[in-house]
Design a protein with these regions (language model features):
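Positively charged n-region of N-terminal signal peptides that target proteins for export
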Residues: 1-4
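Hydrophobic h-region of N-terminal signal peptides that target proteins for export
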Residues: 8-17
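Amphipathic, charged alpha-helical scaffolds that flank and support histidine-based chemistry
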Residues: 38-49, 84-108
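Short, solvent-exposed, charged loop/turn and helix-capping segments
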Residues: 60-78
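Inter-heme linker and motif-flanking segments adjacent to c-type heme-binding CXXCH motifs
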Residues: 96, 118-125
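The canonical Cys-X-X-Cys-His
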Residues: 108-119
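Short cysteine/histidine-rich metal-coordination sites, predominantly Zn2+-binding motifs
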Residues: 126-131
Length: 131
């Protein structure tokens, strides 16, 4: 079953994030799942773990998007680091380790901020544009 899930995720990586609109949808999906985690106190349990695992897949999809744009090694690095943090968070949430889960969530947020600061512009209407 695990092989099927990872195979399905690998197929999705090639399907999603082909253009800016698809990428923005991915980021909204990531934001929704991050919101589930942000509201959880403590940051443990099956809902937090499931959201973190979904976020890890989104980071893979994000990396595919940035690889196609070229000259975005920093964004691909943040995608890798974000995925790693999301998987750490999922593991800690399953184990009930609130301290590790909180630390991993903070690390994950740092990767989001790093990429947003470099690759996102806020428009006058409050929406964002990918640089």
């Amino acid at each position: 079953m695990k092989r099927f899930v990872f195979a399905a995720a690998a197929v999705c990586v090639g399907v999603f994030a082909q253009d800016d609109a698809s990428y923005q949808k991915l980021m909204k999906d990531l934001g929704r799942e991050s919101g589930v985690i942000r509201k959880a106190d403590p940051k443990t349990g099956p809902d937090v773990a499931a959201s973190a695992e979904k976020i890890a897949v989104v980071y893979d999809q994000s990396k595919t998007f940035w690889a196609k744009r070229g000259n975005t090694e920093d964004a691909m690095k943040w995608s890798d680091e974000g995925k790693e943090a999301a998987l750490e968070l999922a593991s800690a949430a399953k184990a009930g380790d609130a301290a590790k889960a909180g630390s991993a969530f903070a690390k994950m947020g740092g990767t989001c901020k790093g990429c947003h600061d470099m690759h996102r512009d806020k428009l006058p209407d409050g929406t964002y544009k990918i640089k």
